[in-house]
């Protein structure tokens, strides 16, 4: 066998290996719940996929910032007269709804209408506000599959990273903030950013008066040491 053929074989093996790793990573991301080692009874139950099949509809938002809305929902909704509770998600910096598709699909498997959009800078809560307005309108459209099937009395919001300030600002600053019944923030960005960037990152969590669930990781991005007194008191 010539050196050239050996090199080609080695290149082919490497390419196949890389492709396999990429495909596995994508599979693992979409099926993250299968690889999560939940400990508590509640965590074990809800980490698993729910018993409902899930469908998705996309809508043009007619807004360059928001881009589009995507709505995941239990497939049974289309032939049901039941109203379903809602979770609206605020993206982290530079992320679009495709990043969180597995999470939103998972929520809908447990009976929620889960909604995202393509806003990559969510911190003010404005795109969450527009999403609620969109849902109110869809709930009143007789030709919509969501006509009178959205439980507007049970809306929760969630956000990751910059989406943390978004959920806080949604309930404290936006017109329909009072419609939100609970919020969740994962690795919420510090309001300390406001002092550095002065571009709308501020929020006042002391004004939030609804059930709130906050989580963060233990790595340096989430749990690094404060480097100033302002960060300590944030």
Identify the residue ranges that each predicted region occupies.
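Hydrolases whose catalytic domains are alpha/beta-hydrolase-1, hotdog thioesterase
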Residues: 166-170, 194
